[in-house]
Curated annotation (Swiss-Prot):
<dbReference type="GO" id="GO:0005789">
    <property type="term" value="C:endoplasmic reticulum membrane"/>
</dbReference>
<feature type="compositionally biased region" description="Low complexity">
    <location>
        <begin position="362"/>
        <end position="371"/>
    </location>
</feature>
<dbReference type="InterPro" id="IPR031398">
    <property type="entry name" value="She3"/>
</dbReference>
<keyword id="KW-0813">Transport</keyword>
<feature type="compositionally biased region" description="Polar residues">
    <location>
        <begin position="280"/>
        <end position="291"/>
    </location>
</feature>
<feature type="compositionally biased region" description="Polar residues">
    <location>
        <begin position="332"/>
        <end position="343"/>
    </location>
</feature>
<dbReference type="GO" id="GO:0003723">
    <property type="term" value="F:RNA binding"/>
</dbReference>
<keyword id="KW-0509">mRNA transport</keyword>
<dbReference type="GO" id="GO:0048309">
    <property type="term" value="P:endoplasmic reticulum inheritance"/>
</dbReference>
<feature type="compositionally biased region" description="Low complexity">
    <location>
        <begin position="394"/>
        <end position="410"/>
    </location>
</feature>
<feature type="compositionally biased region" description="Polar residues">
    <location>
        <begin position="351"/>
        <end position="361"/>
    </location>
</feature>
<comment type="function">
    <text>RNA-binding protein that binds specific mRNAs including the ASH1 mRNA, coding for a repressor of the HO endonuclease. Part of the mRNA localization machinery that restricts accumulation of certain proteins to the bud and in the daughter cell. Required for the delivery of cortical endoplasmic reticulum into the emerging bud.</text>
</comment>
<dbReference type="Pfam" id="PF17078">
    <property type="entry name" value="SHE3"/>
</dbReference>
<keyword id="KW-0256">Endoplasmic reticulum</keyword>
<feature type="compositionally biased region" description="Basic residues">
    <location>
        <begin position="313"/>
        <end position="322"/>
    </location>
</feature>
<keyword id="KW-0694">RNA-binding</keyword>
<keyword id="KW-0175">Coiled coil</keyword>
């Protein structure tokens, strides 16, 4: 029992100490709760103050932004005002300078006005003197004009009489012109006949030349065929013929290439088509074109002659009209060149010289008149165009009238001199060089 009592005493002490600690803790807890409530109230108050401070800070920030924007506007306004001030100051300086310049200019204008006034007075005096001299000159020239008018009337009367005399002389000269035109027309006909005969002769010569060239080509072709066959047979008989030629003759010959070229030449060479000299389509086309060109030339020459005759009737001065044949505008007959290709063409016309009414043909060289047939080597230089002779009727009389019936008759005869009936006859004999082509392609 004593042991139990002894053991219970420390436990009661522990319990008492624990109760006392619990009581302390309770009191401490109550104090902590009270302080917690106080702190909680303070926290609420502080949070409310913090919110109010945040709102005040936002308002202050907004006010600061507004103040900054206002400050920037003020600064920009100040900068603009400074620029305006600088501009106004510069414009003020320029205006002051302009004012000074205007003052100087005004002084100069006043001086020039004074000098202009003095010049005006001087010019006025000179003008009055000029007016007086003009009146004197007008009176003098009026007198001269009256004298010239009387002389002009006398000159008109004299020229009228002279014009009548020249008209009578012109009517007598028209007969001589008609006679000369008739003689020139007859000589022109004879010249056209000579051209026709010459072209026929050339046509025959070219025909015989084409036939001879064809015969010569056929002979050459047959000879080439025989030589090709002979070389082929020799190669078949002696396969080493090329080496033997090289050893004995010291010449390297490619017989296969030679035979192939010969066969190609024989296959490409043809003499079946003949060139016609009269009935070729090129010749008929060229003849129709030449006729159309002749008709066009006749119309142009007729209109030019009508105008020239009108002008000639106004410019006759001498007693007799002179007929001059310009040698530069006459036909050009040059020498015939030797042909070198398969295409043939007509030779040029012989040179023709004329001295007033005397005409002559230059003699041909023996080489031109030769009829020996040679292979073609060069094209003939062709000049099929025959320019009509320009007959210049130099009338030296200067009258404005004349016998218009005689002028019309002379005009028709001059047209007949340039007419196309003789040109068409001669142009029909012109040979188209395209009709003389011989196909000899190698």
């Amino acid at each position: 029992m004593e042991d139990n009592t002894a053991s219970n005493k420390p436990t009661s002490r522990v319990i008492d100490s624990l109760h006392s600690q619990i009581d302390d803790l309770k009191t401490e807890l109550e104090t902590v709760k009270i302080s917690h409530d106080d702190y909680k109230k303070k926290y609420v108050l502080v949070s409310q103050k913090n919110d109010s401070f945040v709102d005040q800070l936002a308002n202050a920030k907004h006010e600061n932004d507004m103040i900054n924007a206002l400050l920037k506007r003020k600064e920009r306004r100040i900068a603009d005002l400074e620029d305006q001030y600088n501009e106004l100051s510069s414009s003020n300086e320029s205006l002051q300078l302009n004012n000074k310049n205007m003052k100087i200019r005004c002084e100069n204008l006043q001086q020039s006005s004074a000098s202009s006034t003095a010049e005006y007075e001087r010019l006025k005096i000179a003008y009055d003197a000029l007016i007086a001299s003009q009146v004197e000159y007008k009176r003098h020239y009026q007198k001269e004009l009256n004298t010239l008018a009387s002389k002009l009337e006398a000159y008109k009367t004299e020229n009228k009489q002279r014009f009548q005399d020249l008209s009578s002389k012109l009517s007598s000269n028209d007969k001589d012109i008609d006679t000369l035109l008739d003689s020139m027309t007859n000589k022109r006909k004879a010249l056209d006949n000579l051209y026709v005969n010459k072209n026929k002769t050339i046509l025959e010569l070219l025909t015989s030349l084409a036939k001879a060239a064809k015969i010569h080509g056929l002979d050459t072709k047959s000879t080439l065929e025989e030589n090709t066959v002979a070389i082929s047979s020799l190669l078949e008989k002696y396969p080493d013929l090329q080496e033997k030629i090289l050893t004995h003759e010291k010449v390297e010959v490619d017989l296969d290439e030679l035979i192939s070229e010969s066969n190609e030449t024989l296959s490409n060479c043809s003499f079946e088509s003949e060139a016609t000299l009269v009935n070729s389509p090129e010749l008929s086309d060229s003849a129709s074109q030449s006729k159309n060109a002749d008709h066009l030339k006749q119309d142009v020459k007729a209109s030019s002659l009508s105008r020239s005759n009108t002008l000639q009737a106004k410019k006759r001065k001498n007693k007799r009209n002179s007929v001059r044949i310009d040698s530069k505008s006459g036909p050009d007959f040059s020498s015939i060149t030797t042909p070198t290709t398969g295409q043939f063409a007509l030779p040029k016309k012989p040179t023709f010289t004329s001295n007033n009414d005397n005409r002559g043909f230059s003699s041909r060289s023996p080489s031109d008149s030769s009829r020996n047939i040679t292979p073609p080597h060069q094209d003939y230089e062709i000049n099929p165009k025959f320019q009509n002779q320009n007959v210049h009727l130099n009338n030296d009389t200067n009258n404005k009238g004349g016998n218009y019936n005689n002028n019309n008759n002379n005009r028709s005869k001059r047209k007949s001199l340039y007419g196309g009936q003789y040109n068409s006859k001669r142009n029909s004999q012109i040979i188209d060089p395209n009709a003389l082509n011989i196909s000899m392609t190698t």
